[in-house]
Regions:
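Conserved pre-catalytic core of RNA-dependent polymerases
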Residues: 1-78, 244, 489
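Short, conserved micro-motifs composed of acidic
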Residues: 49-51, 121, 136-168
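Conserved, non-catalytic sequence blocks in retroelement Pol enzymes and Pol-derived host proteins
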Residues: 5-11, 23, 60-72, 93-95, ...
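Extended C-terminal regions of large enzymes
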Residues: 240, 253-489
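Inter-domain linker/hinge segments that demarcate the starts of reverse transcriptase
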Residues: 117-132, 191-196
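Basic, alpha-helical interaction scaffolds
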Residues: 159-232, 252, 283-290
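Active-site palm subdomain of RNA-directed nucleic acid polymerases
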Residues: 74-105
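Catalytic palm active-site di-aspartate
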Residues: 1-8, 34, 60-64, 68, ...
Length: 489
């Protein structure tokens, strides 16, 4: 359910604002400044060239004022705290997380389990409006029903005055029951706009670099935001690329695609490869779900990843792969082998991200210190699955399975079957890895928990790399042919 608040910024009551600041513990001096800003404000109405007499304002946060959105968000948070604590409003439960709402400024979306919860939500909003001044505009709000529960009012087309829709637009992206309709709204409807923009500029006598700049700044920007929520259909990408190339070459391409996507030093023009560009942006989402914060929008991806790699939910704490039995293990360190798509029960968006990460993390670390911290679990080279007993005994990283670490000689009371499994894991370590370890004088004690990625023979912390670096790496992997230097006119 997406609720629209009537004249959101203009409705907030001043007294409610002051009490909100006091509730959140702002100091007396700060509260006085806020009162100074809002108290005694006057305004007038411009009508047909004439100004009315000035009158005193008792509510609203001025639009355009830098502090207004922050104050509005604080006022709305009071309502959200009440809704989250209300047991009569039941949200969607994902493992231990119950998600009731998400919000961005005045755009609030609610995820409700049943009809009673929806009724209680609207009732709470009505009560809140008497205090804060924020009223729900039911005619502009929308409701998407995914339940089999009867009597929602589908026949009348409304639920308690809120229109029932088949597709819901949230922050510029459509969600709904029909994937075909959503794909059209999110992607295919943009084709005509792209064609119109390029046809206007086609009349100009532009260079290749100028045309490429227009493609990147004006044409691609129309749909890139949507691709960060779900991957576009493959035929949509083909249609967009056809429009781009028709504009760039005014007909049949004169130079191979792998050449023009290269940088200037390699004879290209930095033409954007859409698939690689989208992958480079989206793979950075892994920086969030494998980080130290646990947000509601990470709940589903974490659940799907556990199911994909058959991780027992009781053993894993959020975020995924973090602090397993007091050992730091991370998905990106494991040189994972991503199972086939048919085993993935979640949204294809996250599976595609994992496949991109698999490509990026193929290359071995350059430094031995980083190499020793690679986990032995879910390792596509060692072909291992997670073993609770062995992990609890302290065997989790490459450094743990070699004689230099006296721990393996003691085996920490492991059963014979587990000892044999541990030795078989050690035997699977490639000779080139073993040589690095034998010839290294590095300490076998220190473990670097950060996710290390090797780009152009240099080790980087994954959380610090940019989309541009990832894009260049993907292009380098894709473009294996030697680029010819072309003369740009």
């Amino acid at each position: 359910m997406a609720l629209d608040y009537t004249k959101a910024f203009d409705s907030v009551n001043f007294q409610f604002i002051y009490k909100t600041f006091k509730h959140f513990g702002f100091g007396d001096n700060f509260q006085k400044w806020i009162k100074t800003i809002f108290n005694g404000g006057k305004s007038c109405v411009a009508n047909n060239g004439y100004l009315s007499e000035k009158f005193e304002i008792h509510r609203s946060t001025r639009q355009g004022d830098p502090i207004s959105p922050l104050i509005f968000i604080m006022g709305l948070e009071i309502l959200f705290i009440t809704l989250r604590a209300d047991k009569n409003i039941r949200g969607v439960k994902i493992e231990k997380n119950e998600i009731k709402l998400t919000a961005y400024a005045d755009d609030a979306s609610y995820f409700l389990r049943d009809k009673i919860s929806a009724e209680n939500l609207l009732q709470k909003n009505e009560l809140s409006s008497k205090i804060s001044g924020l009223e729900v505009n039911r005619s502009k709000s929308e409701c998407l029903i995914l339940s089999f529960e009867l009597d929602w009012g589908e026949n009348s087309g409304t639920f308690l005055g809120i229109p029932i829709t088949e597709n819901l637009k949230v922050l510029g992206h459509f969600y709904g029951k029909s994937q075909i309709v959503c794909n059209y709204q999110n992607f295919y409807s943009k084709l005509e706009k792209i064609k119109k923009i390029l046809s206007i500029w086609k009349q100009r006598n532009l260079t290749l670099i100028g045309k490429n700049l227009l493609i990147n700044s004006l044409a691609s920007s129309l749909f890139i935001f949507n691709t960060q929520i779900e991957y576009p259909p493959s035929d949509f990408i083909k249609l967009v690329e056809k429009l781009h190339k028709d504009f760039l070459w005014a007909g049949v391409p004169k130079i191979a695609h792998n050449t023009v996507i290269a940088n200037f030093k390699k004879g290209g023009i930095n033409y954007r490869d859409l698939n690689c560009f989208i992958d480079s942006i989206n793979v950075k989402f892994l920086q969030q779900i494998t980080g130290s914060h646990n947000y509601n929008h990470h709940a589903l991806p974490n659940l799907w990843l556990k199911q994909l790699f058959k991780i027992p939910t009781s053993a894993a704490r959020e975020p995924y792969f973090y602090n397993f039995f007091e050992n730091i293990l991370n998905l990106l360190d494991c040189k994972i082998k991503v199972p086939r798509l048919r085993y993935f029960k979640g949204h294809p968006f996250y599976y595609k991200i994992l496949k991109t990460a698999e490509v990026l993390f193929q290359k071995d670390c350059a430094k031995i210190e980083n190499f020793l911290s690679i986990p032995i679990w879910f390792n596509r080279i060692l072909k291992t699955k997670f073993d609770t007993e062995i992990s609890k005994a302290g065997f989790n990283f490459i450094k743990d399975v070699f004689p230099e670490n006296q721990q393996i000689a003691q085996f920490n009371g492991l059963r014979n079957v587990k000892i044999r499994k541990l030795k078989s894991i050690r035997d699977k370590v490639p000779p080139i890895w073993q040589n690095k370890i034998v010839n290294s004088r590095s300490s076998f004690v220190t473990v670097i928990p950060d996710q290390i990625i090797n780009l152009q023979d240099k080790d980087y912390n994954f959380k610090d790399i940019t989309s541009k670096q990832i894009y260049q790496q993907l292009i380098e992997k894709k473009n294996t042919t030697t680029c010819r230097v072309i003369k740009l006119v």
